[in-house]
């Protein structure tokens, strides 16, 4: 493998994540806060949020010490993904075009992994409640408060979407944006009970 290119990719990924946090601080704050109690949000944070950024940053800043383990893990993942039994081909053409394609597909399939799969283990995601803050170069601060209303015995109904509009464009806008001088505010409630307020 090309170690220099791998380090460049990590640096580029780190930079892109930093930029996305600056441009989407409200959703970043909401996702991170939801990850304290929601396994689904924790997975999303670990694969595309602050949790993911922390892993990428650690790998990029300590590349020399971590590169062997990273390369071994990437190879293991590649063996699990790029397999003959995972290959699905969708092809549209006349019957005449199929024969040359079958030959090309066979060549591709021959390059894929066929060794026995490792036994699958269930993925357990453990949420940890935290009270944390993150510093960026932005002069805008984002604050999020999240929770699960179904866990508190409140069912999801369409009325929550009306509440979202009222909160976001009336109450929160007037009290947080206009009176308080905040940059903006938003709220959301979904069908699995997750709700958040962000300013």
Predicted segments — roles?
Residues 44, 49, 71-105:
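Non-catalytic, conformational "gating/processing" segments within enzyme and secreted inhibitor domains
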């Amino acid at each position: 493998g090309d170690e220099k290119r791998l380090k460049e990719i990590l640096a580029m990924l780190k930079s892109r994540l930093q930029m996305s946090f600056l441009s989407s601080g409200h959703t970043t704050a909401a996702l991170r806060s939801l990850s304290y109690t929601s396994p689904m949000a924790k997975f999303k944070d670990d694969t595309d949020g602050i949790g993911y950024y922390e892993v990428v940053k650690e790998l990029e800043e300590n590349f020399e010490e971590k590169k062997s383990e990273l390369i071994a893990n990437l190879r293991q993942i590649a063996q699990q993904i790029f397999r003959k039994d995972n290959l699905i081909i969708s092809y549209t053409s006349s019957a005449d075009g199929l024969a040359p394609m079958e030959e090309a597909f066979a060549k591709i399939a021959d390059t894929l992994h066929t060794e026995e799969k490792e036994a699958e283990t269930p993925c357990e995601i453990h949420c940890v409640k935290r009270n944390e803050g993150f510093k960026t170069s932005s002069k805008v601060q984002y604050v999020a408060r999240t929770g699960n209303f179904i866990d508190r015995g409140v069912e999801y109904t369409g009325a929550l979407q009306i509440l979202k509009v009222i909160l976001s464009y009336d109450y929160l806008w007037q009290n947080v944006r206009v009176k308080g001088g905040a940059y903006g505010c938003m709220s959301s409630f979904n069908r699995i009970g997750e709700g958040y307020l962000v300013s």
